[in-house]
């Protein structure tokens, strides 16, 4: 259960967030994902209030993240020991819990030695404040370096990798997924429905459906959902995908989630919801599996799209906290 909508002006308020969480847990979902940077900590606070007041804390695996900016100061972001320790204490307070089950580094910090990050995480694990560590939006080579560092320094390691992965952003499957399977790292994809693009609700006109993420989130400066998904290749792939769903009477949500889940090592695809009905729709779709002959058609569409319009993975890798040299600069 993804929770970046909680406390967002375009998302949901606390009452709705609690109703969403209750519906999700009642339906068998037991993984809740958040971040200290989601809506200035409001997401963590809403989750913490619900789990503490309902007495359901031990029914879920609770995951959160550090690294993104949570204030204006130079130490209010990053993967340094200084920031991680402070971030964990603040997350524990907002989440109203004594432990974080899975703590991610939200993205690679190129200006902090990865050993410093892992030693801080190792200490927090020994203190019982976190149970497992994970990485999010890391390039494969950085995850590999982290695993090697943990091995040679005898430190707790990254046990999970979370990144965007869906039919329209398939890059994770090229290298990271097989690498993670080989090294026993769980793969936790987010945005398996491509922010709703795979439902087919957005047409080639380029006009977003009113009230959708594409409509509500500002993309005037680029880099947002429209910049990512509103192009001819994507619309063509979505048309083919939704046609398969219609032909076989299968929900698009089921096919999109099943495509992601078929990859070895994928453990908990994350979807978000702003309304209770969104959760109910996913639970209903996920209650059954599509036949393999249907999924073979879906795989064909995904393979064709990747061959025609490959996308970089992960987005902006290496550009946060330091920029990788360009090809001309590297010569």
Task: Tell where the protein language model's regions lie, with residue ranges.
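Conserved, mostly hydrophobic/aromatic
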Residues: 17, 32, 47, 62, ...
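Aromatic-lined glycan-binding groove of carbohydrate-active enzymes
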Residues: 172-215, 251
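Terminal-tail/helix-coil boundary detector
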Residues: 206-243, 247, 262-266, 276, ...
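Generic structural signal for well-ordered alpha-helices
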Residues: 21, 44, 48, 88-92, ...
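Glycine/proline-rich, positively charged
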Residues: 4, 26, 71-175
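N-terminal binding-site loop/beta-alpha segment at the start of enzyme catalytic domains
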Residues: 1-60
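Short, well-ordered coil/turn segments that N-cap beta-strands
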Residues: 28-30, 56-60, 97-101, 127-132, ...
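Glycine-rich beta-alpha junction loops
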Residues: 66-68, 139, 165-169, 191-202, ...
């Amino acid at each position: 259960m993804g929770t970046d909508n909680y406390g967002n002006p375009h998302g949901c308020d606390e009452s709705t967030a609690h109703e969403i969480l209750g519906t999700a847990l009642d339906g068998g979902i037991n993984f809740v994902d958040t971040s200290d940077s989601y809506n200035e900590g409001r997401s963590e606070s809403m989750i913490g209030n619900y789990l503490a007041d309902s007495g359901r804390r031990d029914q879920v695996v609770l995951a959160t993240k550090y690294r993104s900016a949570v204030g204006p100061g130079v130490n209010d972001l990053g993967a340094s020991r200084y920031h991680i320790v402070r971030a964990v204490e603040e997350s524990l307070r907002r989440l109203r819990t004594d432990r974080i089950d899975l703590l991610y580094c939200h993205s690679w910090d190129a200006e902090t030695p990865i050993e410093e990050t892992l030693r801080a995480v190792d200490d927090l694990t020994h203190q019982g404040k976190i149970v497992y560590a994970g990485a999010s939006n890391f390039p494969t080579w950085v995850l590999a370096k982290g695993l090697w560092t943990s091995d040679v320094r005898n430190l707790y390691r990254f046990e999970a990798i979370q990144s965007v992965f869906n039919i329209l952003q398939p890059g994770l499957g090229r290298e990271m997924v097989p690498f993670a399977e080989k090294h026993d790292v769980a793969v936790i994809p987010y945005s398996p429905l491509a922010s709703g693009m795979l439902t087919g609700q957005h047409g080639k006109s380029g006009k977003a459906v009113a009230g959708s993420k594409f409509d509500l989130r500002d993309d005037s400066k680029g880099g947002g959902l429209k910049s990512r998904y509103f192009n001819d290749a994507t619309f063509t792939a979505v048309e083919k995908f939704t046609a398969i769903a219609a032909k076989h009477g299968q929900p698009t949500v089921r096919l999109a989630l099943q495509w992601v889940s078929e990859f070895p090592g994928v453990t908990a695809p994350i979807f978000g919801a702003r309304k209770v009905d969104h959760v109910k729709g996913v639970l209903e779709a996920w209650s059954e599996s599509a036949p393999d002959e249907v999924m073979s058609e879906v795989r064909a569409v995904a393979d064709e799209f990747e061959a025609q319009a490959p996308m970089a993975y992960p987005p902006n890798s290496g550009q946060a906290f330091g920029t990788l040299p360009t090809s001309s600069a590297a010569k």
